Structures are given as structure tokens and as C-alpha cells.
């Protein structure tokens, strides 16, 4: 049995305060964007296939500032978070340059257990982090950020990013160029919704993209690797209330069966199916689980 409740933003908080979880259901939620509509479906459908647990979905609940208190209060039991987000945005801790995935995971696991009575399970296998993307027409032949620095020194390279990227502290534009000494001829502040079109149309030459964004593949963009480890790790992993693990003793082992099963390419392709082809997240999730042999058709 599954129930689906669509909640967005502040309205979601109001509704959450008015109604509590079903006592017998595991409540899975996500943030209000494509990847976070797909991932709850992957987790939920797999749980339903492998256990007798009833699953309730609360879709598109909000960003991390809403998800964290909802998890802490028990309004939701489970969602997928990214280790770097948990470390920087929730725990307000810094990641060391080049810090390993295991180290970041251990920090967030310890912090969430102490502060929120929730824990992080094994990562799903992909990281959704920043990459510097450019069109292949530019012929920079850059595979790493350091390669892009060298290409920028030839002149004429225009960088475009959302306004928020220029304002971010710790892992925004100013800190980026302190680590990587780019020589941009111009920087532009762009609406995130038009950033890829600006790149495709040649209005800018380089943008900070997310590694699992389906438009990378569909627009045939070239991506680069953060070779100096400037950005923290953003490994995707299930975050679950510890009392839910007690209530459903089989849950932890079942969720950990998904560890390492979703590659960056898998996630990118699934996002593209929803964002570009218009497929439903639940159908994309089902197809993925079937194709990987994780559930029956």
C-alpha cells in the first residue's frame, strides 16, 4: 500500500503540523526538484517489493531547511540527502580540501545521530556535485578544473552562474578562484533556468553545472573534474530516523542493498527522462529497478 501526498515549501510545513504520520507507515519524502522526486520512488518501490512495510510518500516537501526539522520532529522518516549539504548547511561544519567521502560521511552520521536522532546509511553510489561545463565547440580540451585555468589564460573566456553562486561563502565564486586562479574576461549573473541556454547559445563559455543534470547529456556538454578537491563531497545517501529503524527492523538491511547501485550516469539519464522527455518519476524509478534486476516487472 502506498499513499502520496504532495507538499511544497511553507505550505507543506503548515500541513505537516496539522497531521501526523500514519502509525503503521514509513513516510518517505524529498526535495522539490526532479532528482528528489525520483529517489523517494526508488527507495519506496524497493522497500515495498522486499518487505511488508507500508510506504507513504510526501513529495516535494522543501529544501534542507524544511527537511531537517521535519525529520527531527518525526513528520517524515526517510529521505535522500547529500553528505556535503548535511555537513555545511545543516551541521555548519567545514570540509577540508580533498577530504575523503568516508570522512565526510562519518562526520554527518555522527552529527545527525547526536542532534537529530537520525542516521546516514550507505551511499547510493553517485555524487551530485558541481562540475564546470562547456560546449565542445569551444575546443578547450579540458578534463580538469586546472586544465580550464590554463585555457582561461588565453583570454576571452566568459563565466556565467546564478547570483547565489557568487554570494556563497566557502564554496562559491570567490573561494573557487582563490583555489583555481581563473582569468575570466567577464562574469555574468544568470537565472538558473536560462543558464544552459546561455551556454548553448554562446552567451557564456563556462557554467557551474550539477553532475547529474540531464541537460549535460542532452546538450552534449563537456564536463571537468575538480582535481584539487575544492568542493566537498556530495554523496547521495538515505537519511533515516533511528526510531524508524527500530520500528522496522528489516529496513536498514534492505536500504543498504541499494548501496552503490545508482551511478552518476544512471541518475543523469533518469533526470533527463523526467526533465526533457516528460516521463513520470515513479515510472522512471520502476524502470530503473527492473533494469538493474532489483525488482520484478
Residue ranges and their predicted role:
Residues 15-18:
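C-terminal motif of bacterial Sec signal peptides marking the signal peptidase cleavage site
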Residues 35, 166-171, 175-182, 250, ...:
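An extracytoplasmic/periplasmic, membrane-proximal ligand-sensing/linker region
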Residues 63-64, 74-87, 104, 135, ...:
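Beta->alpha turn/N-cap motifs
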Residues 90-100, 108-121, 203, 215-229:
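Ligand-binding "clamshell"
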Residues 20-22:
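Bacterial signal peptide processing site
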Residues 102-158, 242, 260-264:
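A conserved helix-loop-strand patch within extracytoplasmic ligand-binding domains
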Residues 46, 65-76, 92-94, 174-179, ...:
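Short helices/loops that flank or line small-molecule/ion binding pockets
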Residues 25-61, 126-196, 279-282:
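Bilobed "Venus flytrap"/periplasmic-binding protein-like clamshell domains
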Amino acid at each position: 500500500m502506498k499513499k502520496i501526498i504532495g507538499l511544497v515549501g511553507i505550505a507543506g510545513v503548515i500541513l505537516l503540523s496539522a497531521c501526523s504520520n500514519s502509525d503503521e507507515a514509513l513516510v518517505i519524502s524529498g526535495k522539490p526538484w526532479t532528482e528528489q522526486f525520483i529517489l523517494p520512488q526508488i527507495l519506496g518501490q524497493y522497500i515495498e517489493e522486499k518487505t511488508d512495510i507500508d510506504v507513504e510518500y510526501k513529495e516535494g516537501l522543501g529544501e534542507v531547511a524544511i527537511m531537517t526539522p521535519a525529520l527531527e520532529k518525526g513528520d517524515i522518516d526517510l529521505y535522500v540527502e547529500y553528505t556535503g549539504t548535511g555537513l555545511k548547511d545543516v551541521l555548519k561544519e567545514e570540509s577540508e580540501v580533498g577530504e575523503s567521502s568516508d570522512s565526510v560521511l562519518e562526520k554527518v552520521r555522527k552529527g545527525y545521530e547526536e542532534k537529530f536522532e537520525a542516521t546516514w546509511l550507505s551511499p547510493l553510489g553517485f555524487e551530485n556535485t558541481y562540475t564546470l561545463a562547456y560546449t565542445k565547440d569551444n575546443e578547450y580540451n579540458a578534463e580538469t578544473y586546472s586544465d580550464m585555468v590554463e585555457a582561461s589564460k588565453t583570454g576571452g573566456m566568459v563565466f556565467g552562474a546564478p547570483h547565489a553562486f557568487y554570494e556563497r561563502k566557502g564554496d562559491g565564486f570567490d573561494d573557487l578562484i582563490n583555489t583555481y586562479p581563473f582569468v575570466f574576461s567577464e562574469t555574468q549573473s544568470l537565472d538558473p533556468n536560462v543558464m544552459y541556454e546561455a551556454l548553448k547559445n554562446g552567451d557564456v563559455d563556462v557554467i557551474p553545472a550539477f553532475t547529474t543534470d540531464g541537460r549535460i547529456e542532452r546538450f552534449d556538454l563537456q564536463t571537468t573534474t575538480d582535481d584539487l578537491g575544492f568542493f566537498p563531497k556530495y554523496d547521495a545517501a538515505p537519511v533515516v530516523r533511528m526510531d524508524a529503524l527500530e520500528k522496522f527492523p528489516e529496513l536498514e538491511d534492505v536500504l543498504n542493498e541499494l548501496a552503490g547501485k545508482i551511478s552518476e550516469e544512471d541518475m543523469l539519464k533518469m533526470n533527463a527522462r523526467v526533465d526533457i522527455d516528460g516521463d513520470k518519476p515513479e515510472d522512471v524509478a520502476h524502470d530503473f529497478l527492473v533494469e538493474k534486476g532489483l525488482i520484478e516487472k
